[in-house]
């Protein structure tokens, strides 16, 4: 498995864990601001995943076709 794929999977697993944590926070009726902060942290990880995927696409699919 490529290093990029391993990093993407690691980030996605982290986001999955955060989403599971969010579900528990909602079930436990946690403070809304804490939930919001966790949502923002999850969004940040998903943005990193998107950047990694687009970067890999540029390197693999776009630049190699020149």
Segment roles from a protein language model:
Residues 1-66:
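Solvent-exposed interaction patches of small proteins and small membrane subunits
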């Amino acid at each position: 498995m490529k290093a990029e794929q391993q990093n993407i999977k690691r980030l996605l697993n982290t986001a999955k864990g955060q989403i599971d944590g969010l579900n528990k926070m909602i079930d436990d009726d946690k403070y809304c601001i804490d939930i919001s902060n966790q949502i923002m942290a999850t969004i940040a990880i998903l943005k990193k995943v998107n950047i990694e995927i687009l970067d890999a696409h540029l390197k693999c699919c776009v630049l190699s076709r020149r």
